[in-house]
Swiss-Prot record:
Signal peptide: none annotated. GO terms for cellular component: cytosol. It comes from the Bacteria. Its EC number is 6.1.1.9. The gene is valS. This is Valine--tRNA ligase.
Length: 911
C-alpha cells in the first residue's frame, strides 16, 4: 500500500470463491514467523520504542482462559502501538522457579528432596506424569537436590513448549527471540547482582526473628503472600490461678500453646483488670509463673478481654513479645509438631509429664490432649464453644500458618522505614494506573505494611543467595560477616561454587566456609523483570544499547490480585536500584468468572482450557470476547460473545470480498485477475458517501483516543458499532450504484457517482482492516492481503488517521447515513409486516421524519429508493418537534405514513 496526499493505492489480488476463518491461523502464523513481523528492531532511540514488561506466567501445568483474557488486553495495545509507528519491545518470559513448580514436579515424577543424598547422574524417576494426582510424601522417592533441580528444568521445558504454542495460536505479537526464564543464567545473574547491591547499601539484611511459616511447604512466607480465610475452631474458657488459687479466666482457640505462655495481657483502659497489672498467676497444667501486663493492642470486647501471650500463636503475640520484651518460649517445630524435648521453663514435675504426652504430636492432636487434661484438672470452665475466625494462610497452602523463629533475609520496602514508605507512596502517584481507581489498592497496601519484605525461602528450585559464611574454630557459621563474590563471577551456586581464597576441602569445616542454602522467593526474581528483559547492568555493548532504548519501560500489564506482590515489589526494586519507576503505565485486568460468577482458578477446579474455545470458535473470536471486557472489571466466560466475535470476523471477510469484487467479477461471479485501484478522497462526491466518510473520521478519532487511554474495550465498541452500520446500512444503500445498476426507471448512475461509491467502499474497508487489526489479527491480515498485495502485513501498516476521511467528507454530517439507514429500515418493515419478499417493489410510499431527517433522507433519496425498490412516488413529510412529541412519535424518528406494495416477484422454478 502507498499513501500520499490521502490517496490510497491498492494492489488487488484475485479473490477466493469461498471465505471463512478456518485455516487462517496456521497460514498467517507461518508468514509472520518467516517475515519477522513482530521482531524488535532496536534501531532507534528511546522515544521511538514502546516497551512492555509482559507477565511471565507461572509454569506449573496449564493455562486457563483467564490468562488468554488478560494477555489479549496487552496484545491489543502492543499491536496498536506498532501501527502507530513504535518499535515495540514485547518479550515473553516463563516464571519457572518456586513452590508451584516444585509441587508439580513432586507429583509428576513422584519424588522429593533429601539434601543428604548424593547426585545420581543415571537417576530415572518412578513416574512420568500422574494426571495431576497428588502422590503422598511417604510414596515419593527421595533424591538429591541436584537431581530434583534437573527434573524441575526438564518438566518446565516441556510445559513452556505447550504455553508458547498456545500463545502463538492466540496470535500474540510476541518477539519470541526475546524469551527469558526466571531460573535461567541471565535472570539469576540479574537477581544476584541486585541483591548484592542491596546488601552493600544496607537495604538487604538478615535477622533471627519470628515469622510466618508454612508447615506443608516448610518455608517462611512473606506478608504479601498471605490470604486471610475463615477457619473453624473452638473457644476454650481456661483458668489461670493466683498464688492463693483464685482463678482469672482467659478464652483461647489454641489451648495447645499453654506451655508457650509468657504472660497475660489486657488493655490498660480495661477497668476489670487494672487492679491486676504487675501481679503474677500460674498457668494451668504446667504451673509456670507469668505476669499480667497491659498493652493497648488488647481488645476489651474480644473473649474475656484478657488474653494469654504465647510465643507464638499469632502476629499479635509477636507485637506484644517485641513491645513488652517478653521471653521466647517456642514449642512448635518447623514441621508443625510440638517439640520433642520438654522445655526448661516447665519445672513442675506434673507439668513436665503433661508436656511429654504432647511431644512430637501435631497441634491438632496436642490440642485434644490438653483439653482433656484441663477437664480433669478443673481448669476448663464449661465446654468449648464453636467459633469461626479469620486465620492467615499461605496463598498456595491449605493449613493455617504457624509463627516460627528462624534466620531469614529481608529487603527494605517501607514496612519499617517511614521515609522509604513515603517515597514509595509518591512513586505510586507518579504511576499511571488503568483504571485509575486501582491506585488506592496500591496505596492501601503500602500504608498497611508492618514489616520489611521477607525474601528467603527454605526450598530448592530457585535463585540461590550468592553468599557463604566463615566457619569459626568451633565449627559455627559467622552469619554477621557473609562472604560475597565479585559481580563478574555471577551467577553462582554457593552449594557448588567456592568463595575466593578458599578451596572445596574447606567447605563445612572449622576455619573454612559454609554455603547459604536458602533460595530467593520467586517474587524476588519476578520483581526484577524490567531489569531482566532490558539487560540492566550487563557489560556488553548490545545489552547497554537495549537497556538505553527500553528502560524505564512503558507498560506493565497484570492482574489486579497481584498489585501487592508483583507490582509493588517491582516498584520497590526499581526505586532502590534505579531511582525511578520501572514503567510509566500499569494496566490491571479483572478476573474471569465461571457461569456461577465465581472466580475461575485451577484450585477451584472450574477452569476452562483455552485450547477448547480457540479450536471451536477461532482465535479471533476468543480475542474478541477478551477485548470486549473493560480493564479492572471482572468478566464472565461467555461463549455467546465468542460467537459474536466469529461472526464479526466472517462479516469482515465477506464484506471486503463483496466490495473488492465490484466491477471485477466474471459471469460466474469469480474474480480471477489482479487489479490496481486508487482510492482518492477527492473522488467521493455523493452526499451519502461523504456522510459515511464523516462517520469514519469520527470513529477513527474516538478509537484512537480510547486506545491512547488504554481503553481497548471502548475503542472496540466504537469500531464494531460503525462496522455493522457500514455493512448493514451503507453497503446495502450504495451497492446498486457501485455496480452501476440502472434504477427501476432505467436510469444509469453517472460514472462520477459510481466512482464515488467504489472509492468510499475502498477507503472504508481499508480503514476497518486497520482498525480491527489489533483485535482480529488473522481475519484482518487475510483481507489486507486481498487489498494490498506485496505491501507487507497490516500489522506493520500505519494506524488510520482522520485526514483522508475528513477530506472525503468535505463537511458532510455523519447523521445523513443514520437517517438514510432508518428510512431503509422502514421500507424493509413494510415488506416484513406484509410477509412478502424484500425484492417486492413498493409502488408508492410516504415517510415522515423530523425536519433535519427529511433533509438528510432527501439528499440520499436515490440510493434509498433503489435499496428499498421504490418504483413510484416517494414522498417525505416533515414533522415539527412539537408535533412529534404530541403524537408520541416512535423512537425510530422515521415513520411510514402511507405505502402501496406491488406484486412480489415470481419464484424461480426449482430444477
Amino acid at each position: 500500500m502507498t499513501e500520499g496526499k490521502s490517496i490510497i493505492n491498492a494492489n488487488l489480488t484475485p479473490l477466493p470463491d469461498k471465505v471463512g476463518v478456518d485455516g487462517l491461523e496456521d497460514k498467517w502464523r507461518a508468514v509472520w514467523d518467516e517475515d519477522g513481523t513482530y521482531k524488535f528492531r532496536n534501531t532507534r532511540d528511546r522515544k521511538a520504542v514502546y516497551s512492555i514488561d509482559t507477565p511471565p506466567p507461572t509454569v506449573s501445568g496449564s493455562l486457563h482462559v483467564g490468562h488468554v483474557f488478560s494477555y489479549t488486553h496487552t496484545d491489543v495495545i502492543a499491536r496498536y502501538k506498532r501501527m502507530r509507528g513504535y518499535d515495540v519491545f514485547y518479550p515473553m518470559g516463563w516464571d519457572d522457579n518456586g513452590l508451584p513448580t516444585e509441587r508439580r514436579v513432586q507429583n509428576y515424577y513422584g519424588v522429593r528432596v533429601d539434601v543428604s543424598l548424593p547426585y545420581d547422574p543415571d537417576f530415572k524417576p518412578p513416574f512420568e506424569g500422574t494426571d495431576g494426582k497428588k502422590i503422598d510424601a511417604k510414596d515419593q522417592v527421595p533424591i538429591s537436590r541436584k537431581n530434583f533441580i534437573e527434573l524441575c528444568e526438564r518438566l518446565t521445558a516441556q510445559d513452556e513448549k505447550l504455553f508458547e504454542a498456545l500463545w502463538r495460536k492466540l496470535g500474540l505479537s510476541i518477539d519470541w527471540s526475546q524469551t527469558y526464564h526466571t531460573i535461567g543464567q541471565h535472570p539469576q545473574r540479574v537477581a544476584q547482582k541486585a541483591f548484592l547491591r542491596n546488601l552493600a547499601r544496607g537495604e538487604a539484611y538478615q535477622q533471627d526473628a519470628p515469622g510466618l511459616w508454612d508447615v506443608t511447604f516448610q518455608t517462611a512466607v512473606a506478608q504479601a503472600e498471605l490470604e486471610s480465610r475463615e477457619y473453624p475452631g473452638f473457644y476454650h474458657k481456661v483458668a489461670f490461678r493466683f498464688e492463693d488459687g483464685t482463678p482469672i479466666y482467659i478464652e483461647t482457640t489454641r489451648p495447645e500453646l499453654l506451655a508457650a505462655c509468657t504472660s497475660l495481657i489486657a488493655n490498660p483502659n480495661d477497668e476489670r483488670y487494672k487492679q491486676y497489672f504487675g501481679q503474677y498467676v500460674y498457668s494451668p497444667l504446667f504451673k509456670v509463673k507469668v505476669p499480667i501486663l497491659a498493652h493497648p493492642a488488647a481488645e476489651m470486647d474480644k473473649g474475656a478481654g484478657i488474653a494469654m501471650c504465647c510465643t507464638f500463636g499469632d502476629v499479635t503475640d509477636v507485637e506484644w513479645w517485641r513491645d513488652l520484651k517478653l521471653p521466647t518460649r517456642p514449642i512448635i517445630q518447623r514441621n508443625g509438631r510440638i517439640v520433642m524435648d520438654t522445655p526448661d521453663w516447665i519445672e513442675d514435675p506434673a507439668g513436665r509429664e503433661v508436656f511429654a504426652e504432647t511431644a512430637g504430636k501435631t497441634t491438632f492432636s496436642a490440642r485434644k490432649i490438653i483439653v482433656d487434661k484441663l477437664r480433669e484438672s478443673g481448669d476448663l470452665d464449661g465446654e468449648p464453644t464453636p467459633t469461626k475466625r479469620m486465620t492467615n494462610f499461605y496463598e498456595k497452602g491449605d493449613k493455617p500458618l504457624e509463627i516460627v523463629t528462624s534466620r531469614q533475609w529481608y529487603l527494605k520496602n517501607g514496612g519499617t522505614d517511614a521515609k522509604l514508605n513515603a517515597e514509595l507512596i509518591e512513586r505510586g502517584k507518579e504511576l499511571e494506573f488503568h483504571p485509575d481507581f486501582m491506585r488506592v489498592r496500591y496505596e492501601n497496601w503500602v500504608h498497611g505494611l508492618n514489616g520489611d519484605w521477607l525474601i528467603s525461602r527454605q526450598r530448592f528450585f530457585g535463585v540461590p543467595f550468592p553468599l557463604w559464611y566463615p566457619v569459626n574454630a568451633s565449627g559455627e557459621p559467622d552469619y554477621d560477616h557473609p562472604i560475597t563474590p565479585s559481580e563478574d563471577r555471577l551467577p553462582i551456586d554457593p552449594t557448588i561454587d567456592v568463595p575466593e581464597g578458599y578451596d572445596e576441602s574447606q567447605r563445612d569445616v572449622p576455619g573454612g566456609f559454609t554455603a547459604e542454602k536458602d533460595i530467593m522467593d520467586t517474587w524476588a526474581t519476578s520483581s526484577l523483570t524490567p531489569q531482566i528483559v532490558t539487560h540492566w547492568a550487563e557489560p556488553d555493548e548490545a545489552s547497554k544499547a537495549l537497556f538505553a532504548s527500553t528502560f524505564p519501560m512503558d507498560l506493565r500489564p497484570q492482574g489486579q490480585d497481584i498489585i501487592r506482590t508483583w507490582l509493588f515489589s517491582t516498584v520497590d526494586r526499581a526505586h532502590l536500584e534505579n531511582k525511578c519507576l520501572p514503567w510509566a503505565h500499569a494496566t490491571l485486568s479483572g478476573w474471569i468468572l465461571d457461569p456461577d460468577h465465581k472466580k475461575m482458578s485451577k484450585s477451584k477446579g472450574n477452569v476452562v482450557v483455552p485450547n477448547e474455545p480457540i479450536e471451536k470458535f477461532g482465535a479471533d473470536a476468543v480475542r474478541y470476547w477478551a477485548a470486549a471486557a473493560r480493564l479492572g472489571l471482572d468478566a464472565t466466560y461467555d461463549i455467546g460473545q465468542m460467537k459474536i466475535g466469529r461472526r464479526l470476523a466472517i462479516k469482515l471477510l465477506n464484506a471486503t470480498k463483496f466490495a473488492l469484487a465490484i466491477g471485477r467479477e466474471d459471469e460466474n461471479h469469480h474474480v480471477g485477475a489482479a487489479a490496481e485501484a486508487a482510492w482518492n478522497p477527492a473522488d467521493v462526491t455523493e452526499p451519502l458517501d461523504r456522510a459515511a466518510m464523516a462517520k469514519l473520521a469520527l470513529v477513527v478519532r474516538q478509537a484512537t483516543e480510547a486506545l491512547e487511554s488504554y481503553e481497548h474495550s471502548k475503542a472496540l465498541e466504537v469500531i464494531e458499532s460503525y462496522f455493522w452500520q457500514f455493512c448493514d446500512d451503507y453497503i446495502e444503500l450504495v451497492k446498486n450504484r457501485a455496480y452501476g445498476t440502472p434504477d427501476e426507471h432505467g436510469n444509469v448512475p453517472s460514472e462520477k457517482a459510481v466512482k464515488s461509491a467504489r472509492t468510499a467502499l475502498g477507503l472504508g474497508l481499508d480503514a476497518f482492516a486497520r482498525l480491527l487489526a489489533p483485535y482480529l489479527p488473522y481475519a484482518t491480515e487475510e483481507v489486507w492481503s486481498w487489498m494490498h498485495a506485496g505491501s507487507g502485513s497490516v500489522h506493520r501498516t500505519a494506524w488510520p488517521v482522520v485526514d483522508p476521511y475528513v477530506e472525503a467528507a468535505t463537511g458532510a454530517s455523519p447523521e445523513l447515513l443514520t437517517w438514510a439507514g432508518k428510512a431503509v429500515e422502514q421500507l424493509r418493515k413494510i415488506k416484513s409486516e406484509a410477509k412478502v419478499s424484500m425484492k417486492t417493489p413498493i409502488l408508492s410510499v410516504a415517510l415522515s421524519a423530523a425536519s433535519e431527517g427529511v433533509e438528510a433522507i432527501h439528499a440520499a433519496l436515490g440510493d434509498i429508493a433503489q435499496a428499498g425498490r421504490v418504483v413510484g412516488k416517494f414522498d417525505l413529510v416533515a414533522k415539527h418537534a412539537e408535533e412529534s412529541a404530541a403524537e408520541d412519535a416512535p423512537e425510530t424518528e422515521v415513520a411510514v405514513e402511507a405505502s402501496e406494495l406491488g406484486e412480489p416477484p415470481a419464484k424461480k422454478p426449482k430444477h
